[in-house]
């Protein structure tokens, strides 16, 4: 797999770690808690984001259990107050402002105040998150994946989901790249680049941290080569079909429907794998090695 461009370069180094809150029990809330917060202060809806951990990210789909995250970036409070008041403010004044303008959030976080103040990871005030310069990348369309897994679990997110520090994201929603990442060949490459991180159910798990992922070669497409474009477009089409089939599988209520969509996904996977092998120019012998490797 020496053909292509390293993933880190391919995505312009746009690979980001999930957020470290220092106290998830304070910032990660249920949909019910979110409704209560927004009911008390409707403006707070902009500070509540959909949230996932690495364990929620599966292959081509997301197991969404309705978790949300209160996101108050470092420096946000001062910036908001400065819109209507000039000069510096004390923490007490800033807290009073938060209680007046975002009562639901202030009430919720106040119950965690002691623990929040003890965090190493915090912003200007105990209710803010630590400094982060890639919030816009979390809001944007992206490919997401867990930091540790025993098989490919890459998915696309186009709804602005925020991630825990058990997950990563790539700054692209390319379905072509998603198909490559979830292919047997890519997992074979990752398993040979990354270092095993213990086992689960008798299978090795691998760390998908930046220092390993950035090295995985992504096959670039030469527009002057007709077959490159054909394969790229076909992979994109097939991945789109997998994503749709996964949605149907998740909502299937009968065993017949589940079996149908599971079979459809497996067929699409095989077609994608075949195209990936062709793109990388694998020989029959090399394909056999990849196919025999555990997934």
Protein language model features and the residues they cover:
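Polybasic, glycine- and aromatic-enriched phosphate-binding surface used to engage nucleic acids
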Residues: 1-228
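Non-catalytic DNA-recognition/assembly elements of restriction-modification systems
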Residues: 2-7, 104, 218-295
């Amino acid at each position: 797999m020496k053909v292509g461009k390293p993933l880190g370069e391919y995505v312009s180094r746009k690979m980001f770690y999930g957020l470290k809150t220092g106290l998830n029990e304070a910032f990660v809330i249920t949909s019910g808690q979110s409704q209560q917060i927004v009911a008390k202060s409707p403006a707070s809806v902009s500070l509540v984001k959909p949230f996932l951990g690495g364990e929620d990210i599966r292959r081509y789909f997301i197991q969404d259990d309705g978790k949300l995250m209160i996101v108050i970036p470092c420096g946000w409070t001062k910036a908001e107050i400065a819109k209507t008041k000039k000069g510096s403010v004390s923490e007490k004044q800033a807290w009073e402002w938060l209680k007046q303008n975002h009562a639901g959030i202030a009430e919720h976080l106040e119950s965690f105040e002691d623990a929040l103040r003890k965090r190493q990871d915090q912003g200007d005030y105990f209710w803010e998150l630590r400094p982060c310069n890639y919030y816009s990348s979390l809001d944007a369309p992206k490919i997401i994946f867990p930091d540790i897994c025993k098989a490919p679990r890459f998915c696309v997110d186009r709804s602005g989901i925020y991630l825990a520090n058990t997950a990563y994201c790539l700054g692209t929603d390319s379905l072509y790249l998603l198909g490559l990442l979830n292919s047997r060949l890519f997992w074979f490459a990752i398993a040979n680049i990354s270092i095993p991180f213990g086992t689960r159910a008798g299978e090795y798990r691998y760390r998908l941290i930046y220092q390993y992922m950035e090295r995985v070669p992504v096959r670039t497409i030469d527009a002057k080569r007709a077959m490159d474009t054909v394969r790229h477009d076909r992979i994109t089409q097939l991945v789109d079909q997998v994503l749709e089939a996964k949605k149907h599988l998740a909502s299937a209520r009968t065993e017949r429907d589940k079996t149908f969509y599971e079979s459809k996904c497996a067929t699409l996977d095989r077609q994608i794998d075949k195209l990936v092998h062709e793109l990388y120019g694998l020989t029959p012998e090399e394909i056999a090695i990849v196919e025999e490797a555990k997934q």
